[in-house]
Amino acid sequence: MTELNKLTVAESVKGLKNKDFTSKELVNAYIKQIEKYKNLNAYVTETFDLALKQAEAADQNYGQNKARTLEGIPFAVKDLFCTKGIRTTACSNILKNFIPHYESSVTQNIFDKGGVILGKTNMDEFAMGSANITSCFGNVISPWKANDDNSDLVPGGSSGGSAAAVSAFMASAALGSDTGGSVRQPASFTGLVGFKPTYGRCSRYGMVSFASSLDQAGIFTRSVLDSSIMLEAMMGFDEKDSTSINAQVPELQSAIGSSMKNMKIGVPLSLGEGGIIEHDIMKMWHDTIELLKNAGAEIVDITLPHAKYGVAVYYVIAPAEAASNLSRYDGVRYGLRVECENMTLDEMYEMTRSAGFGEEVKRRIMLGTYVLSSHCMDAYYFKAQKVRRLVANDFNNAFAKVNAILLPTAPSAAFKIGKKQNDPTIMYLNDLFTIPASLAGLPCASVPAGLSARGLPLGMQIIGKQLDEYNVLKVASTIETGVKHIKFEPAGF
């Protein structure tokens, strides 16, 4: 029998319904795995007592035929979703001991379906990073190793703890957030399915804000079917979020395995020109095109002429919004406060923020403050917003001809911890292919599609029209089926 912690969400639900095992046994299997691999630093707060209590309640519900969709399913939560009574820090010293008095809407939605929380996962501080190396709790280590080198690799970021937890079988699924690629890129690096729904599909209420016009909850799973199950539980209109979309949550599970007949897939191959993409990634892209063509899809050449400006636009708009959002951390109402005798209020602000924020967060606050200053706003911020509109228009034009768009998730496989740490510009380019869809607020997923020559997982990205998570899942499922001969599991776990 498969080890309990290696079951997918769908398999776990089936096993619990059939009384093959109890939720308590399932939770204990995950707790054992978490204890065994603490060296990965995937979790920053463990909630084992609560998990076992929730599991006991789930087992009672199964016994009384009252089981809900996710009854007894253990999951992990990125540490920027507020969890009532459970420490929530965004992995920043400025919030290191903050305990919320309310629950985020997304976590509440999962609890309402019977989910069991194992703990809060590590992340880049305030979700600012692509390698999970800016956390105040230290780096997350990927469970994957290259076949020619035993060096520790990054799991991707900013949701690296969630990615490492699911990849190393320390959670059946894990919540992440995706602002410019923070679910999709780690999913690519760790051999997982990572899904970011349409902006507004999942409530942002109770999420610690980075860039409000871009932030969106996402999910890590080990299968496309699991993604559809979790998304159905997570999504929904919320009056507490002014950006929430009042649209019916679709039935998504029927997308899995459905026919690709009459599907048109757009491929912007011009984005791969210029030697930006590693050879293995380019080969995977072409192999996936052939896979979809053989499955019955029509491949259409498209262009996204303004996508090349995505990174530049993102690093104007996102830091500008971050500078505004993070101004609330002043040491007065909650979080860290640095105090000295005879200090003024301004000095307290300065010392608290200097001590509480890490270097990358400070860099982005300074950049955001600069582009919002009166003499720079026209030249940078307003211009970036105009180009953002052009990026969205490019997608609209493409979707007039196709049902979905296919491109790589990241330009490379996972890299060594510290390799790109000293050059922010090179680090920012990790999100080269994920940022454009975020700027347009589109649903997208990363699905494992191949291995590099060094044995590391590579992900393909599928982008859909607004509110069309169904077709994204359909294409992702077809790719998953086409590469089922490849084992996307880290060795030794």
Curated annotation (Swiss-Prot):
EC number(s) on file: 6.3.5.7
Catalytic activity: L-glutamyl-tRNA(Gln) + L-glutamine + ATP + H2O = L-glutaminyl-tRNA(Gln) + L-glutamate + ADP + phosphate + H(+)
SUPFAM superfamilies, A to Z: Amidase signature (AS) enzymes
GO BP annotations listed: translation
Keywords noted in UniProt: ATP-binding, Ligase, Nucleotide-binding, Protein biosynthesis
Catalytic residues (positions): 78, 158, 182
Gene Ontology cellular-component terms listed: glutamyl-tRNA(Gln) amidotransferase complex
Molecular functions (GO terms): ATP binding; glutaminyl-tRNA synthase (glutamine-hydrolyzing) activity
UniProt KW ATP-binding keyword: yes
Keyword Nucleotide-binding recorded: yes
NCBIfam families: gatA
Family named by the database record: Belongs to the amidase family. GatA subfamily.
Function: Allows the formation of correctly charged Gln-tRNA(Gln) through the transamidation of misacylated Glu-tRNA(Gln) in organisms which lack glutaminyl-tRNA synthetase. The reaction takes place in the presence of glutamine and ATP through an activated gamma-phospho-Glu-tRNA(Gln).
Name of the protein described by the UniProt record: Glutamyl-tRNA(Gln) amidotransferase subunit A
